[in-house]
Structure formats: structure tokens, C-alpha cells
Amino acid sequence: MAHPLDLNQLAQHIKQWGQSLGFQQVGICDTDLTAEEPRLQAWLDKQYHGEMAWMARHGMLRARPHELLPGTLRVISVRMNYLPAKAAFASTLNNPELGYVSRYALGRDYHKLLRQRLKKLGDQIQHYCLEQNNLDRHDLELHDLEQHDSERQGQPEQHTASEINFRPFVDSAPIMERSLAAKAGIGWVGKHSLILNRDAGSWFFLGELLIDLPLPVDKPQEEQCGRCVACMTTCPTGAIVAPYTVDARRCISYLTIELEGAIPEEFRPLMGNRIYGCDDCQLICPWNRFSQLTDEDDFSPRAVLHTPQLLDLFAWNEEKFLRVTEGSAIRRIGHLRWLRNISVALGNAPYLDSIVLALETRRGLHPMLDEHIEWAISQQLARRATQAVEVQLPQKKRLIRAIEKGLPRDA
């Protein structure tokens, strides 16, 4: 007689396999995100998604993973640490002549690596279930020798390996990965809208494996932010407009990565030297005192992007930009937006003749870039005329102190 698949045992195997594949944590949840739909719709209605039209276009599909892969019963959520050694947070942010790149983008693009590991996890599950199914089939054949077929009529149908279907996702489809991660017990959603884990902070990537097995689910973690609003008060542009709510239109990550056109002038002075993304809301978070370094070589910083001189980066032509950023998440913004972002950072730097000269040599490449170059030159000349001394914004002063005191390993 065939035995049903032991799903509890399989769930334990999945977590062990996941850790052997380099994931620091694996959790399992169902697909029900109906509670998230009103919040998602309200966020879209307020236009907080900015020019990311695909978010509005996909609408509530993001909260319905079972529609992405029909038949999906569970989501296997994983996290993988990405914080590199010697992250140089404070030393880079505190030097206006350097360019700050969000630490997730210093190494190779994470999408392919995580997707491949998730595919391997799915293959292991499939292989295990096939083996179990073959054992069951062998038992059933032995049993059939002793029992007439008619005696087995009416027995409940067992889940067989041939029915298993899975699909990996890594920030590559309309799916609410943070809500799923929270539901799967990976962590809780912080007020900056990122997932926090009490043992690992927030410096990790998320990935999902949708599967049609009714695996046992994990319990969510209790939210541990309490009254803390450090991320909200530290955000340079005030993008965290309410607890758990980010107005992407104000977020430096959106402005430097997702926005294709001109960066609104009101935000440019607030961007400082951040040229690709922003980590401030993570850097100030007390839970990141417990962050763990990555053990993935692919996430190690490329030397040319680690504490880079702005003028050196600004001198890259398109060929060099494409060559240096091959396999990097940075490449997706293209050379034009790369120069746009660096122009803003140069405009925020202390006056130097070499900065003005470098900006002037880039005139005429594109009208959008020209507009940022003219702004940056005007900022430089105004600073020279007043002999202005750089004055750090209160949020930045507080952030640098917090990093040096709370994250000395990564300062």
C-alpha cells in the first residue's frame, strides 16, 4: 500500500537544502495576501510608485502569487546576506569627493545567482518527491500481488511527484516578496518597508520559490520596531511618509535608479554624494548592529566601485561604463543616467576648479544631462563666490555618528 508523502519531513529537508545552497534562512507560507490588497491599492492611488508604471499595470496581481503560477499552494521564501566586509559606509558618505553606491550593488548582480540557487532547490524537491513516488510505486506493486485491484477501489488518491510544479522568483515578477517573507517567518516589515530580522538586521536579498505542494507553514515573527522612528527621521528626502509607507518619488534609490528623466531640483542638494541608491534607513537601524557579513564571493565589492573618486567615475565613456559594470546591477541605468547622478554629486561637492572643468567638458551629450550639468556648475560657482564651507545636514551628522559608534566594523 502506498504511503502519503511526509510533508513535515520534506519541509525540514527543504530548509536544510536551502542552507546548504547558501541561504541563511528558509521559510514557508501560503499564498493568501488579501489583507495586503487594500494597502497596495491605496499606495498606488496616491501615486507613490512614481513613474514605475508597471506597478500600477500589474495592480493586485502582486498580492496573488497563485495567479502567477496557477496551482501554487505555498511560497518558499529565502534570504541571503549581501553585506561585504569593509563596507566603508561612514568614510564614503563623509567624503564629498567620493561616490556612494548602495552596498547591494558593489558586487555582481544578485538576480541570476539567487535564481539559480532557487532552481537547484526546486530540483532537489522534485528529485526527492520522485524518489519517494518510486518507493511508493514499488510498495504498491508488492501489495497488488496480494490484493485484487477491485479491493483498492475507493481509496483516496495520493499526491504524486509528476504533479509537482515550481517556479523561482527574484525581484523579477509582480510579487510582494516582503509581505511573503514576513508571512514565512523570515522577519518583520520595518517602518522603512524593508524586512528586518533580529539576528541579521536587513542586509540580505530575498527570493521566492512558488510550488504546488501543501507544505506546513511557518509562523510570522512579531514586529520589533516598537516606538523607534530612526529610519523615518534620518531619510535625507523624507521619503518614509508614514510608518511602513515609502513615497518612491522622494526616495534616493528611486531617483538614482528607477527615474529615467530629470531629478527634481528640490531633491538634488539632499542627495549628497549618493550616486546609485541609498542605505541611510538601514544604516541608522539599531537592528543592523547584528548584521552578518556575506560569504558569497560574488557580492564582494569591485575595487573600482569601492570608495571611488567622483571625478574618476565621471570621466568614464560609455564603452568603459559598460565594460566595468558588466554583470553589475548598475549597468541597467545606462551611461546617461550614471552621468546624471554623478553630476548632482559633483554639484554638491566643495568647490574645485577641476570639478567645473569636468562638468563643462560633458556639455552637449544630451539635453537632460545638460540640465543637471548646468545646475551642478551653478552650485559650484555659487559656493566659490561665497567661499562656502561644507555644512553637513543634521541627519547626515547623526547618521555618521551612529555608524561609527554602532557599526564600527563597517564604518
UniProtKB/Swiss-Prot annotation:
It is found in: Cytoplasm. The active site is at residue 171. Residues 213-245 form the 4Fe-4S ferredoxin-type domain. Transmembrane segments: none annotated. InterPro entries: 4Fe4S_Fe-S-bd, 4Fe4S_Fe_S_CS, QueG, QueG_DUF1730. It holds the Pfam family Fer4_16. Monomer. HAMAP family: QueG. This is Epoxyqueuosine reductase. The lineage of its organism: Bacteria, Pseudomonadati, Pseudomonadota, Gammaproteobacteria, Enterobacterales.
